Amino acid sequence: INWKKIAEVGGKILSSL
């Protein structure tokens, strides 16, 4: 599991809300 990738994608999702 690539936690850095998950965090990056998660951050983009949160910033788009």
Curated annotation (Swiss-Prot):
Superkingdom of origin organism: Eukaryota
Tissue spec: Expressed by the venom gland. This peptide is also found on female cuticle and nest paper. The venom could be the source of these peptides, which could be spread all over the cuticle by the frequent grooming movements of the female wasps.
Coiled coil: none
GO cellular component: extracellular region
Keywords: Amidation, Antibiotic, Antimicrobial, Immunity, Innate immunity, Secreted
Record carries keyword Zinc: no
Residues with Leucine amide modification: 17
Reported function: Shows antimicrobial activity against the Gram-positive bacteria B.subtilis ATCC 6633 (MIC=2 ug/ml), and the Gram-negative bacteria E.coli JM109 (MIC=8 ug/ml).
Protein name, entry field: Dominulin-A
